[in-house]
C-alpha cells in the first residue's frame, strides 16, 4: 500500500496521477481548519474583542467552566510517568473519530519530546489533580500546527473541555507569535466557531494488487465521514471574508 497524504490545493498531483501514476486514486477526507492570526492579537482578550457579541459571551462561559483546569508543560523527563495515560486519552479521541489512516505508537509523544523539543510541545491538563486531557502542537516557522489531542470524554460537557483545549491552543499560538494556526480535521463546526475556515487537503492511495486497487475508491467513499456541519462566522467583520469552501 502506498499513501501520499495531505497536499494543499497548489501541490495536487492530479495531472501526475493521470499520466505517470494512474494507479493512484485522489481523495479528500475532511478539510483542515485554519485560523489566520491577526497582527493586533497579543492576548486572548484581543482575540475576544474581535468576536461578535454572542460568540464573545460563549467564549467567556467556556473559559469560566475551565477555571478549575490546570495545565503543565511536558518535557522528556516529567512526561514519563504520564506516558500511558496520555496514550489512553489519545485513543479515546482516535476511536471516537472513526476514520484514521494511521495509529500512533505508544512511544510517539515521548520520542518527539526527546528529539524535537525545539518545535514540539505537549501540555497535560489536570482537574482536581487528575490528568484528564492533553494537547500537543508543532511550531513550523510562522505556522502553529495543532497536533494530536486527547481527553476524558466524561468531563467534556461539564467543563467544555474540548472547547477549552481549542482556546488554549489559540492562546499558545498567540504567545509564540504565529501567523496562523492549523487546527487540523474533525469537529469542523466547533473549530469554525473559534474562527477557523476549511481548506481542502488531497491524499493519494494505491495498492500493488490491481484487484484491491479497483475497489479502493468504493471503500474510501464508504469510510469517509459525513460532511454535515454549519460554518460559523464569529468575527465582527466576517461578512467581509469570502472562502469558496464556506457553507451558508
Residue ranges and their predicted role:
Residues 87-88, 97, 184-248:
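C-terminal catalytic domain of photolyase/cryptochrome flavoproteins
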Residues 2-157, 213, 238-248:
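A conserved beta-strand-loop-helix scaffold within acyl/acetyltransferase catalytic domains
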Amino acid at each position: 500500500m502506498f499513501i501520499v497524504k495531505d497536499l494543499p490545493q497548489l501541490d495536487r498531483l492530479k495531472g501526475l496521477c493521470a499520466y505517470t501514476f494512474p494507479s493512484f486514486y485522489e481523495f479528500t477526507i475532511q478539510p483542515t481548519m485554519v485560523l489566520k492570526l491577526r497582527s493586533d492579537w497579543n492576548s486572548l482578550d484581543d482575540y475576544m474583542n474581535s468576536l461578535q457579541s454572542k460568540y464573545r459571551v460563549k467564549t467567556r462561559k467556556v473559559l469560566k467552566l475551565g477555571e478549575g483546569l490546570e495545565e503543565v508543560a511536558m518535557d522528556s523527563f516529567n512526561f514519563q510517568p504520564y506516558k500511558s495515560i496520555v496514550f489512553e486519552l489519545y485513543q479515546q479521541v482516535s476511536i471516537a473519530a472513526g476514520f484514521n489512516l494511521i495509529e500512533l505508537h505508544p512511544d510517539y509523544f515521548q520520542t518527539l519530546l526527546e528529539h524535537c523539543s525545539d518545535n514540539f510541545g505537549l501540555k497535560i491538563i489536570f482537574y482536581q489533580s487528575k490528568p484528564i486531557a492533553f494537547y500537543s502542537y508543532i511550531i513550523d516557522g510562522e505556522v502553529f500546527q495543532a497536533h494530536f489531542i486527547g481527553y476524558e470524554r466524561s468531563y467534556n460537557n461539564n467543563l467544555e473541555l474540548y472547547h477549552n483545549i481549542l482556546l488554549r491552543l489559540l492562546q499558545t499560538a498567540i504567545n509564540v507569535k504565529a501567523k496562523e494556526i492549523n487546527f487540523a480535521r474533525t469537529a469542523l463546526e466547533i473549530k469554525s466557531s473559534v474562527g477557523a475556515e476549511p481548506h481542502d487537503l488531497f491524499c493519494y492511495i494505491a495498492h500493488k494488487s490491481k484487484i484491491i486497487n479497483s475497489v479502493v475508491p468504493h471503500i474510501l467513499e464508504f469510510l469517509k465521514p459525513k460532511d454535515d456541519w454549519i460554518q460559523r462566522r464569529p468575527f465582527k467583520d466576517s461578512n467581509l471574508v469570502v472562502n469558496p469552501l464556506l457553507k451558508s
